[in-house]
Amino acid sequence: MKNFNSLKTTLILAFAAITVVSGFSACKKESDAKPTISQVAVSMGGFSQLEAAAIRGGVAVVLSNKNPLASSGGAYTVFAPTNDAFARLGLVNPEDLNVLQKSFLTNVLLYHVNNGNTLQTALTGGASIPSLLGPAKRIINRNGEFYVNGSKILATNVAADNGTVHVIDKVLLASGANIAQTTIFFATAKGFTSPELSFLLEAVLYCDLAGALSDATANYTVFAPTNQAFKDLGTILGVPLNQPSDIRKLPRNTVTQVLLSHVFNLTGGGKFTSELNPGIITALNGKSVTLGAFVNGTLTVRGSGNSAAANMAIPDVQTTNGVVHVIDRVILN
């Protein structure tokens, strides 16, 4: 996964403008100097987890000067997740960040930053916003409220000496790779320090669906069950699924149909939560799946065979051929 594994010094320096380290006050020589992005973030409060993430990600170097890139006008734009945004992922305290690989964390942070001043006037529905990581972000208008991917924009145009800050309610995630590669990335513990989606990966390989999920011309919406979701499925079926290879105890056709119930070719391509509406959607295998109400930025997902709906554990992971939402139950039809 090229974007996850190749970090450039210039990108690391770029994100440093939103972090705080010792010696910070020395950068401000005059009492009337306009605050930097880092000073603005600290003064607003509620961004201590973002600071801790930047430090752990190896990008905690304060820039007292402006963006050196000539075309940037000396500015950066930062979409800044609040502490509550990190808490959605279970990252409540600084030590919780240890569950993320450092290189992954760094790339996550860089996805929130772009060169130049991107003001609110540019945040219109359908707009594409670049990032220092590479993949672009999408601005979505949902009933008059604006989102960047699936993250609601809470505040805009917070001015700084070296750019602009917009406040958002979710951490933005992008893999820079296709759906199959993204699954491999997490299953091999390159994102989290413990493997995740490894049961899903085994199922995809067992059913020979990796090619379909790698299709560069596709633009799928995928609901990806966690490892625990597959273990729970084993309990339901009476077939212990204690490790990924146990998936092969089940008939291949059965597993194939289960997997296809999680993949959707929706009109307009892969959908972020901000683009999904309550109601019935049709999976690749023709089965109907019900989306629940849009509450606090997520929706539940339920098949006709589920006794309870699945919740989104990690929503809105952007890939090169769709959007992945990690869920806590396997969809059954």
Each PLM stretch: what is its role?
Residues 2-9, 13, 21-333:
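Mature, structured domains of secreted/extracytosolic soluble proteins
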